[in-house]
Amino acid sequence: PAPNYTLYYFNGRGRAEILRMLFAAAGQKFNDKXXEFN
């Protein structure tokens, strides 16, 4: 079975976008968790 990945990041300026593209290109499912700046 494939591992279950979770991407944790702060919203802002698309910094996690490259990681999302890499997961998609690899066909890897992942959980996307965004945190807001307070």
Curated annotation (Swiss-Prot):
Q: Which UniProt keywords apply?
A: Eye lens protein
One GO MF term attached to the UniProt entry? structural constituent of eye lens
Alphabetical list of PROSITE patterns matching this protein: GST_NTER
Q: Does the keyword Signal apply?
A: no
Which residues belong to any copy of the GST N-terminal domain?
Answer: 3-38
Does GTP-binding appear among the keywords?
Answer: no
Q: Which InterPro entries match?
A: Glutathione_S-Trfase_N, Thioredoxin-like_sf
State what this protein does: S-crystallins are structural components of squids and octopi eye lens. Contains relatively little if any GST activity.
| Listed name of the protein | S-crystallin 3
Species: Nototodarus gouldi (Gould's flying squid)
